[in-house]
Amino acid sequence: MPQTHEMSLNGTQYLKYELKDLESRAHDAKTPSTNEFYDDVESHGTEELVEAKLSFLNRIAAGLSAETKGIEPITEDEKTDDSILNAASMWFSANMVLPAYAIGALGPMVFDLNFGQSVFVIIFFNLLGLVSVAFFSVFGAELGLRQMILSRYLVGNIAARIFSFINFIACIGWGIVNTVASSQVLNMVNPGHQCPLWAGCIVIIGATVIVTFFGYGVIHAYEKWAWVPNFAVFLVIIARLARSKKFVLGEWTSGPTTAGNVLSFGSTVYGFAAGWTTYAADYTVYMPRKTNKYKIFFSLVVGLATPLYFTMILGAAVAMAAIGDPAWKTYYDENSIGGLTFAVLVPNSVHGFGQFCCVLLSLSTIANNVPNMYTIALSVQATWEPLAKVPRVIWTLLGNAAALGIAIPACYYFSTFMNYFMDSIGYYLAIYIAIACSEHFIYRRSFSAYNVDDWDSWERLPIGIAGTAALIVGAFGVALGMCQTYWVGEISRLIGDYGGDIGFELGLSWAFIVYNIARPFELKYFGR
């Protein structure tokens, strides 16, 4: 096992690099980061004042050992995170959480699949989704580019900015959905003296702020151990489930309706596993270029697959038990997965200790929120150059504040709408993967084809005409293939009695076809 790199980005060495980076921005007018932060200072007095204030904020952040680096490429001198364990544990903790457990329960509860069918879907579609996360994590170490900056090479400059905006919406949306779910679990604990929903939101977001403010180093240090209490709670759930003797395998079914349900559940599982794709490189950019790429890839595969399989299969097992028990089913119908977990752990079970376990499980969402609220800042900066002038720490704080401001009313008025909205926005991942993989494997073929110095050059980066066309056409494919409560596409409704969700499949395939038709023309007439 590689030696663990203990918080190398948070001590004296990290602070030295941060201060050095800030000084170079202030004095070297030839660097890309200087152009970003100090453009037209001499001719614009107001801008000079704003830039000075932003520089001051960055210095405060650096003084607190917080990461001040934004979307600028990470230099080789700054690549000090040589721990493969850091890369793997990042996603291990982020997926050993309540939301992944909740996804698994959907197989029996929503899609009428038995335990065996649910497990098959969980194994197959998770594997399809997580491979892209592991693959693009390799790019972070090799090129030192954030995922949305890397996207300028992979999908084109214009399309990358569209994806950056969508990614920003996804980050804040999933942060809201996760926070609402956790606050609802906290609200069930200690009947008669419950934690108010708004207070639960403050607890979850507040803890997320503390971790994400300090950036890469503290995030990896937190995620390295955040899985431990969550895993312990899941073991307690397994023990209580076994003692209840309520688990059943269920009956095997077949036919078009079952096929449609398998596809729909598979779409949900795939979306959760692949959801980290547009974040991937952000969490390996400080790894040295010499790091073995196969070790990164396969450690990420294990770090992703293990918690996803474990939590989702457990969720499916608990759901199967609830199907045969009216009391547990009522808890689920009224309070979703949080209610079902409460039913397993508290009434006629371990009582006070069970409530304590519910609290721990609700706090597990912090580990899932942290990547959202860190990447949100980088996505905003990558959308438009003026936004990159605002320090990362400010965007992180603003993103968390926005999530809190929306999550509190969502708890009371529109939590269902938020879930529907996020189910819809997740389809962009398949389109992104189709375009990005096409560009790398068909047109670039090796890392040597990426000139990192071009990261902010409109003249040298791919324009993004092909990428934008593929995104638009892929979106039409998604609309025809998606199967949600509020929308069933014309093609998806042909599968079974309730439709089958093939939005990811159509979006990916249509985007792939259009991109590879348009990209050769873009290269021929524009040369990039």
Swiss-Prot record:
<keyword id="KW-1133">Transmembrane helix</keyword>
<dbReference type="InterPro" id="IPR012681">
    <property type="entry name" value="NCS1"/>
</dbReference>
<feature type="topological domain" description="Cytoplasmic">
    <location>
        <begin position="140"/>
        <end position="161"/>
    </location>
</feature>
<keyword id="KW-0472">Membrane</keyword>
<feature type="transmembrane region" description="Helical">
    <location>
        <begin position="296"/>
        <end position="316"/>
    </location>
</feature>
<feature type="modified residue" description="Phosphoserine">
    <location>
        <position position="43"/>
    </location>
</feature>
<comment type="similarity">
    <text>Belongs to the purine-cytosine permease (2.A.39) family.</text>
</comment>
<feature type="topological domain" description="Extracellular">
    <location>
        <begin position="243"/>
        <end position="260"/>
    </location>
</feature>
<keyword id="KW-0597">Phosphoprotein</keyword>
<feature type="transmembrane region" description="Helical">
    <location>
        <begin position="417"/>
        <end position="437"/>
    </location>
</feature>
<feature type="transmembrane region" description="Helical">
    <location>
        <begin position="341"/>
        <end position="361"/>
    </location>
</feature>
<feature type="topological domain" description="Extracellular">
    <location>
        <begin position="112"/>
        <end position="118"/>
    </location>
</feature>
<feature type="transmembrane region" description="Helical">
    <location>
        <begin position="494"/>
        <end position="514"/>
    </location>
</feature>
<dbReference type="Pfam" id="PF02133">
    <property type="entry name" value="Transp_cyt_pur"/>
</dbReference>
<feature type="transmembrane region" description="Helical">
    <location>
        <begin position="394"/>
        <end position="414"/>
    </location>
</feature>
<keyword id="KW-0813">Transport</keyword>
<feature type="topological domain" description="Cytoplasmic">
    <location>
        <begin position="1"/>
        <end position="90"/>
    </location>
</feature>
<dbReference type="GO" id="GO:0072530">
    <property type="term" value="P:purine-containing compound transmembrane transport"/>
</dbReference>
<feature type="topological domain" description="Extracellular">
    <location>
        <begin position="317"/>
        <end position="340"/>
    </location>
</feature>
<dbReference type="InterPro" id="IPR001248">
    <property type="entry name" value="Pur-cyt_permease"/>
</dbReference>
<feature type="transmembrane region" description="Helical">
    <location>
        <begin position="162"/>
        <end position="182"/>
    </location>
</feature>
<comment type="function">
    <text>Probable purine-cytosine permease.</text>
</comment>
<feature type="topological domain" description="Extracellular">
    <location>
        <begin position="183"/>
        <end position="198"/>
    </location>
</feature>
<dbReference type="GO" id="GO:0005886">
    <property type="term" value="C:plasma membrane"/>
</dbReference>
<feature type="transmembrane region" description="Helical">
    <location>
        <begin position="119"/>
        <end position="139"/>
    </location>
</feature>
<dbReference type="InterPro" id="IPR026030">
    <property type="entry name" value="Pur-cyt_permease_Fcy2/21/22"/>
</dbReference>
<feature type="transmembrane region" description="Helical">
    <location>
        <begin position="199"/>
        <end position="219"/>
    </location>
</feature>
<keyword id="KW-0812">Transmembrane</keyword>
<feature type="topological domain" description="Extracellular">
    <location>
        <begin position="482"/>
        <end position="493"/>
    </location>
</feature>
<dbReference type="GO" id="GO:0015856">
    <property type="term" value="P:cytosine transport"/>
</dbReference>
<feature type="topological domain" description="Cytoplasmic">
    <location>
        <begin position="220"/>
        <end position="221"/>
    </location>
</feature>
<feature type="transmembrane region" description="Helical">
    <location>
        <begin position="91"/>
        <end position="111"/>
    </location>
</feature>
<feature type="topological domain" description="Cytoplasmic">
    <location>
        <begin position="282"/>
        <end position="295"/>
    </location>
</feature>
<feature type="topological domain" description="Cytoplasmic">
    <location>
        <begin position="515"/>
        <end position="528"/>
    </location>
</feature>
<feature type="topological domain" description="Cytoplasmic">
    <location>
        <begin position="362"/>
        <end position="393"/>
    </location>
</feature>
<feature type="transmembrane region" description="Helical">
    <location>
        <begin position="461"/>
        <end position="481"/>
    </location>
</feature>
<protein>
    <recommendedName>
        <fullName>Purine-cytosine permease FCY21</fullName>
    </recommendedName>
</protein>
<feature type="transmembrane region" description="Helical">
    <location>
        <begin position="261"/>
        <end position="281"/>
    </location>
</feature>
<feature type="topological domain" description="Extracellular">
    <location>
        <begin position="415"/>
        <end position="416"/>
    </location>
</feature>
<feature type="modified residue" description="Phosphothreonine">
    <location>
        <position position="46"/>
    </location>
</feature>
<feature type="topological domain" description="Cytoplasmic">
    <location>
        <begin position="438"/>
        <end position="460"/>
    </location>
</feature>
<dbReference type="GO" id="GO:0015205">
    <property type="term" value="F:nucleobase transmembrane transporter activity"/>
</dbReference>
